[in-house]
Amino acid sequence: MLQIAMKTGKIKLFSIVGILLTSVLLSACSVPFLSKPQGPVTLEYWGLWESPNTIDTIINDYKKINPNVNISYKKRTPQQYRESLENQIAQGSGPDIFTFHNTWVPMLKEELDPMPASVMSKTDYKNSFYPIAMQDLTIENEIVGFPQGYDGLGLFYNEDIFKAAGITKPPVSWTEFTQDAAKLTVKDESGNIRTAGAALGAASNVDNFSDILGLMILQNGGNPKNPKDKQSADALDYFTSFTKGQNRVWDETMPASTLAFSGGSVAMYFGPSWRAIDIKNANPLLKFKVAPLPQLAGAKVTWATYWANGISANSTHKKEAWDFAKYMATDEVLIKLYAESVKSPGRFFGNPYPKVNLASKLASDPIIGAFVQDAPFAGSAPMASRTLDNGLNDQIIKAYEDATNEVLAQSNATGALETASASIAQILAEFGAK
């Protein structure tokens, strides 16, 4: 009996030792001093608009708290950027982190990595950014990017022309806008426009015409992706009315609208915030401000067009890439990025902040403030100008350009948009968009 007890004791002892050894071996993977040291991680980041000097300042700060992560920023050219991005990621190369437009999500659904819940909860994301971010930057209810700024349309107005006409404030409704545009227009004896009340009504020489028309369709309750409805036709009729007949306030003999506004020959002009930089550089003495967009009666609706940072679905360092993308969207970094951007030659301000809690920092700015005030009410559609995507936006814009020209040539808006709708349906199907 004693021998059996001793053997049993040995077996128990060996079992305990075995369990302990196994535990040590299994835990070696998680204990730093027992695991194999990992080398530094290198991430490639593609951007479009910010200079390497600006981004490198942010990268250097990040590296101080993440010394094992190296980030190489490459500023790409906008032309054929979207196609190059898709092709390289499809081939297993390309960047880990990349900039993309808010309307590109349907085209990049294979390339964008869904954000893990551990990075940020959907509730925190929704509470942090303007509502349009959650609307635009998701695929099947999964978040795929962090907005790096916010932009849209603002109503630029020439202070001197307003003062000369006795108008003391910018219009807040489209009714006021129409009345002011007529009052601000100056023509010569032959009926030629010398000072345009508003740069509006044509596709050929109205920069950002598609954004303006898209805004009007959304405000009127139409569907920019399927503009067969009466609301869309009414919006197109209203848009083109500014160039028609004896009461026109703009026409196709005028220079391109940004150039005309910069030259002081237009009272009101619509554009994104970055156009203010072009205008100030072209004419530093021009006195102008930017107001929130005119509205119809009812719910307020504005327009968004902005850029975000996403992570490649093929990245081998997704954890580190998402961590940096989140870092780029923190309050401190956005504020510093804004300040660093202003240091670039010809820049007077940075990107408007995409976060709700930072709105008060820019709300009183005579240029940026209007965009921040409009941001909570923004909608969007794939007809945003200047994305240079050769895809959804550029092709849908062409369909709307043709429809606008047809109406200016005396065609019916409903008929013109029926043709456009057929083209838009094909374009959406080609890129797998809804």
Please annotate each region the language model reported.
Residues 180-185, 223-251, 293:
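Glycine-centered hinge/linker elements that transmit conformational signals in sensory
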Residues 39-50, 69-74, 96-97, 198, ...:
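Short, well-ordered beta-strand elements
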Residues 163, 377-434:
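Conserved C-terminal helix/tail region of periplasmic/extracytoplasmic solute-binding proteins
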Residues 142-148, 153, 175-225, 266:
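Extracytoplasmic/periplasmic solute-binding protein
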Residues 1-44, 64, 422-434:
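Short, low-complexity disordered leader/linker segments with a strong preference
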Residues 101-153, 178, 194-195, 209, ...:
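Hinge/lid segment of periplasmic solute-binding proteins
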Residues 61-132, 136-138, 163-172, 267-268, ...:
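Extracytoplasmic "Venus flytrap"/periplasmic binding protein-like
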Residues 103-106, 278-285, 297-398:
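C-terminal lobe and pocket-closing loops
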